[in-house]
Amino acid sequence: MEVAANCSLRVKRPLLDPRFEGYKLSLEPLPCYQLELDAAVAEVKLRDDQYTLEHMHAFGMYNYLHCDSWYQDSVYYIDTLGRIMNLTVMLDTALGKPREVFRLPTDLTACDNRLCASIHFSSSTWVTLSDGTGRLYVIGTGERGNSASEKWEIMFNEELGDPFIIIHSISLLNAEEHSIATLLLRIEKEELDMKGSGFYVSLEWVTISKKNQDNKKYEIIKRDILRGKSVPHYAAIEPDGNGLMIVSYKSLTFVQAGQDLEENMDEDISEKIKEPLYYWQQTEDDLTVTIRLPEDSTKEDIQIQFLPDHINIVLKDHQFLEGKLYSSIDHESSTWIIKESNSLEISLIKKNEGLTWPELVIGDKQGELIRDSAQCAAIAERLMHLTSEELNPNPDKEKPPCNAQELEECDIFFEESSSLCRFDGNTLKTTHVVNLGSNQYLFSVIVDPKEMPCFCLRHDVDALLWQPHSSKQDDMWEHIATFNALGYVQASKRDKKFFACAPNYSYAALCECLRRVFIYRQPAPMSTVLYNRKEGRQVGQVAKQQVASLETNDPILGFQATNERLFVLTTKNLFLIKVNTEN
């Protein structure tokens, strides 16, 4: 069995600035333009049954504004009329109204459990689109932005099950066929999950293809599914379609894929076996066994036989648990009851009071013993002489090396540790793994549309931008830019909603849920002489911070950055902030 290579991200030292002195607040005005929308943005709020943190990450914080990275300063959104609206900026002072480029053929409001409609630009002439009801569209657009050749035409249209959003897609063209590969994200209910949230994350990799020599329609040729317990921070298909890269807090694994299906089913079965069949706890006098019952169970479905050193439990004519008990019980005083939480509670009275049972039924490993805090403390006290001869062998342990009260919230490391994984598209096995440790994921950005999206991670106080290169097996992730101290600065923005940067790295920006936008520029040469009095030296460069406050009380729904402009979307308006004047 092949083991995935354990890799690390190599930081380029020349891109770091250890002498960075921070951002200087600039009061220079930022030109801001406002466009009123003909129809409101098709926002879909979370339902009552979408209550988990993963629902919030995937759908509650969804970016409703989409940037076409193949064409400069071109953004799209979907309104309540089912129209895909486009705004392409040529001149800030002569802004036109957003124009309709396509209209969804289905009524968005007809589906009760729909998600937000999503769109992804696979290439300069292809688009993937989801209406939020579970239907996937592949659309040929012609050359977007060219009125003579642009025409949005549905080339593939199929229902793919439960509603999903599109995470990423690519277009693959060779002499024999044209393919579109796309990633679809769902959060689905898991009935067997008793202890977790009751949901799991599903990431489906779908490939749609058409042979060039045939006149056949586009059809699905491959569907693979990954499952996990957390929404991926980042997921993208490699440009050649041979692999997949994912950044996530909890790992995702393939569960349905041709030759590996049987193997994965065996893994799933073994996982289910590991789940405790019952839970039990004990005191000095008795034992309590708790069993989760199937739905609609009644007293008539339960048969329990107590013997002095034996127990037999039958549920709905099926043997549930049978065997010799670890020690004797008072079988005449033992009882059972059905609780309101649809669970069966069995009370066993010990014959030998004070005896601690290490197991309930001899040789049975299907149950889990739950210890209370008093028992744990008593056991620890009895074992103390085995671990230390002194009550306090390390008296300095209580004296931390620094005063925790002096630490700011953004100094504290995150408990969660994400990982970056690369999956092979043919074997569906993990080939490379990077443990990101405390390198917090911040955002992703498309620098070159022909390459995979970049992702930005916090490294100490800085924010480092990484470009994946699937063709370089030994050095898959390149450090291409650094935003000085931005990892530290963003941590203090507790109301931040979206994070972005310019494709040319000239600035990074984040917005809060309401109104305010913060812009952090890269250090630039000074036009005047400035001295650092403490060090008695001339300062050559200064990094500026600017703040824009939008004239609206509506929450921000979308946020995109280009080299020259920031686009901010609310329910009724689209704002343009001119950040850079240089072309």
Curated annotation (Swiss-Prot):
The modification Phosphoserine is found at residues 8, 388. The gene is NUDCD1. Isoform 1 is the dominant immunogenic isoform and is capable of eliciting a humoral response in individuals with a variety of solid tumors. Expression of isoform 1 in a wide variety of malignancies as well as the presence of an immunogenic epitope suggest that it may be a suitable target for antigen-specific immunotherapy. Pfam families: CS. The keyword Nucleus applies. It comes from the Eukaryota. This is NudC domain-containing protein 1. Transmembrane segments: none annotated. Isoform 1 is specifically expressed in leukemias and a variety of solid tumor cell lines and is also detected in testis and heart. Isoform 2 is predominantly expressed in testis and weakly expressed in tumor cells. Residues 273-361 form the CS domain. One of its GO terms (biological process) is immune system process. It comes from Homo sapiens (Human). GO terms for cellular component: cytosol; nucleoplasm. Keywords: Cytoplasm, Immunity, Nucleus, Phosphoprotein, Tumor antigen. Gene3D superfamilies: 2.60.40.790.
